[in-house]
Design a protein with these regions (language model features):
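A short alpha-helix-loop-beta-strand transition element characteristic
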Residues: 401-409
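A generic structural-conservation signal
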Residues: 70, 234, 356, 404-405
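Cysteine-centered catalytic environments shared across enzyme families
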Residues: 1-237
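ATP-dependent adenylate-handling active sites, centered on carboxylate activation for C-N bond formation
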Residues: 55-58, 137-399, 412-427, 436-442
Length: 443
């Protein structure tokens, strides 16, 4: 007589954590179970979902937040644990008496833009099947920067419109603001939306981190706001360099990539300061995903990349090399699908509800439609100058607002002084990775 497998699913993500703007959570789960995965694209907002139909389980997430799972073995069959954090999975396994099966490298990240299907059939567990639900057409816009800019900023403004519409008018809105292109575009688009709705811009604040008196971002932010006449929105959050703890950031984001650790470290300092000043503040927008969309990363810093690979590979910076590639990490995913934790995890640590409009499919689709190869003609310099032109022209055509354009600078470089950066960062990635593993050994 064949033994009947009894599978359990332990979902640690409450429905209240879903930020779906246009349907109930159960309706979104129904789309996840439908035959055509493209239906998941109808879900507006931020989500990390699981749906079950017998032995079949499907998972999907938006690009702005993580979704992880672990398959444990029980006497009667497999147990699937689903959470947005590795330590939550570890703790759940320990409570269920399966702590000995856990290792952080055995956890799996659901890759963004895919439906992940798992069959709970018991030992041996089959590999998951990935079915893409977001596949925007590439390079379909004309090589006209005015048209490109207008298309891209219209998509940005639509995401901001949907976000603002879902938040009670009494709730204040903040932007994590450096004066750079992406946070600047979000601030101007949000300011424009509030005016269009007949609401006071006093509801809005631009928060800038200043470590040890301020790095280059503080001066840049002040110049940006001065040139746009929005000085009244500015709030500076002061923090000492001693408060920057990259090892604490490793624990929060559960990753060890140096650039993400550095970004999360300064992000934690900024969010901590906002929370101390405003105990009840919830809603914060940021510019995360803007660099990925318009491919504004220095290719020279990555020996694995060429300009051809950057402009010719679909959503390279959003997804990494893709789920079919050898280099794709099962534990972490790739690209912003992995790096989303640098913003999401710190925000959740301090009780904020984060919003990254550049990470939404509507905006990414507008970016993927840009004919990058035709526009750049193999030139790094043209590629690096493209984002400023696209955003500046687009914001002017859509909102009538003039976007100040400054040279690119990473958040962790602009928020701190050079001396503070040298003192707090620059450790070898092995140190961060070892620290992450040690956290689970202690657990």
């Amino acid at each position: 007589m064949r033994h009947q497998t009894i599978a359990r699913v332990l979902n640690l993500i409450p429905d209240e954590d879903q930020q779906i703007l246009n349907m109930a959570v159960d309706d979104a789960r129904a789309l996840l179970l439908a035959e055509n995965p493209a239906g998941v694209l109808r879900i507006e907002g931020s989500f990390a979902l699981i749906a079950r139909d017998g032995q079949r389980v499907r998972l999907a997430r938006s690009l702005d937040r993580p979704l992880r799972y672990f398959l444990a073995k029980e006497k009667d069959g497999p147990m699937l644990v689903v959470a947005d954090r590795i330590d939550q999975i570890r703790d759940a396994l320990e409570r269920e008496g399966h702590g000995g099966q856990f290792h952080p490298s055995y956890t799996r990240m659901v890759p963004a833009h895919h439906v992940t299907e798992i069959q709970l059939v018991g030992c041996p567990d089959p590999n998951p099947v990935y079915r893409r639900f977001f596949d925007p057409p590439r390079e379909v816009l004309p090589p006209d920067l005015d048209v490109i800019g207008e298309t891209y900023v219209q998509a940005l403004c639509e995401e901001i419109r949907l976000w603002v519409a879902a938040i009670p008018e009494r709730e204040p809105l903040g932007v994590l603001f450096s004066g750079g292109l992406d946070s600047g575009a979000v601030l101007l688009a949000l300011y424009h939306e509030l005016l269009a709705r007949g609401q006071s811009p006093a509801r809005l604040k631009a928060f800038t981190l200043a470590v040890d008196g301020g790095g280059a971002d503080l001066e840049q932010a002040r110049e940006f706001l001065g040139r746009t006449g929005l000085q009244m929105l500015h709030e500076v959050i002061e923090a000492p360099s001693a408060a920057l703890d990259p090892f604490a950031a490793v624990a929060v984001i559960e990753d060890y990539k140096p650039l993400d650790v550095e970004c999360a470290t300064v992000n934690l300092a900024l969010l901590r300061g906002i929370r101390e000043r405003y105990p009840d503040w919830r809603h914060l927008a940021d510019g995360d995903g803007g660099d990925e969309n318009l491919k504004d990363y220095p290719i020279e810093e990555n020996p694995e990349l060429t300009i051809r690979s950057v402009v010719n590979n679909r959503m390279l910076y959003q997804e990494g090399w893709g789920v079919e590639a050898i280099k794709h990490s099962l534990t972490y995913s790739g690209g912003l699908s992995r790096g989303c934790v640098r913003g999401y995890a710190p925000a959740r640590r301090y009780g904020f509800s984060p919003f990254s409009p550049f990470s939404r499919p509507r905006v990414i689709a507008a970016a993927e439609a840009i004919p990058f190869a035709e526009l750049t003609r193999g030139s790094h310099e043209i590629l690096y100058g493209l984002k400023g032109e696209v955003l500046r022209r687009g914001l002017w055509r859509v909102t009538g607002l003039d976007l100040p354009v400054f040279p690119k600078r990473r958040f962790q470089h602009g928020a701190v002084t050079r001396e503070a950066f040298r003192n707090q960062f620059g450790l070898h990635p092995v140190r961060y990775r070892s620290h992450l593993l040690s956290l689970h050994q202690q657990g």
